[in-house]
Amino acid sequence: MSLHLSNVILHQLCKNDQDELVVKLRPASLENDTSTENLVAELHRVFHSKAGKGFGSFQSDSEFQFWLQEMRKGERDFYDFSQISANRLKEELIKYPFADEGILVFAEYQSLATDYLFIGILPMNQSLKVTEGLDIDATDYLDITKMDIAARIDLSSYDTDRESNRYLSYIKGRVGRKVADFFLDFLQADVGLDTKQQNQVLMQAVEDFCADSKLEKQEANEYKKQVYNYCNEQIKSGDEVQISELSGELPPSQDGTSFMDFTKEQGYELEESFPGDRSTVRKLTKYVGAGGGLNISFDSLLLGERIFYDPETDTLTIKGTPPNLKDQLSRN
């Protein structure tokens, strides 16, 4: 990939003899060479591919934002910025139960004509290597694919549009780890773009467009499948759902109204682009539900053909069970 590296530095988060988390600061930035460029390129790729990211923007009195502005103006060098930010990050991190040890990386770079600042904690793991004497020895390595404490600032968007609610993005982390809260506190930022809500609004707009266009059931299912296929491809490639691009792939209504025009005319508050949410868009082609010991999922086109729902009795009737399920049932 095309990546231009401006600055990168590593610091270390580790426990001292009192089991307290401390920062071991590197005395200078790393050299910009093939190894550091490859590291940052991999960090960019892995972060870009992570699903379920959160978005936000700085609070007006954010100290971190003030330091960042100083660096962008040349009033504070990158090393000093990384040092003061690393200490602030450590002070916030110790407030949380996931105060992990690891390698703290700050990287300023450009990719595809966009400037970024990346901040992340990379877990260290051990593996085995074969020495020149053909012996087996232990070796440490950065487990980049497992990182779940990372944030990235789109500096180009930040410089041109301070009112944006999404120039800051962060990995939300595993359930129960409150990584989102940590990064918002560390960066002194507020939650911005709600990607889940944007996906839900898109799904409602698709439903309403099909109803407003008076599409037959099969036509509506085909329309929803097209939307799902587009969104799913965007998710798999790590790209965002572009409403104008999606609209261009969909047939207009009978009166010639495009999907994009429909969303604007009806007042759906959709961003021009946003990350797709796999669990939400899946509901375009499937009915999914779980609870009370049941976990049910079936293609939407089966409703009314092999699967019937009676709302009065709250009963779901399935005609023709899958062979493997039928086999299990017949043995009991």
Swiss-Prot record:
Cell location: Cytoplasm, Nucleoid
A Pfam family recorded for this sequence: NA37
Family from the record: Belongs to the YejK family.
Sample GO molecular function, one term: double-stranded DNA binding
Presence of keyword Acyltransferase: no
Name of the protein in question: Nucleoid-associated protein VIBHAR_03026
UniProt KW Nucleotidyltransferase keyword: no
GO cellular-component term (any): cytoplasm
Keywords annotated in UniProt: Cytoplasm
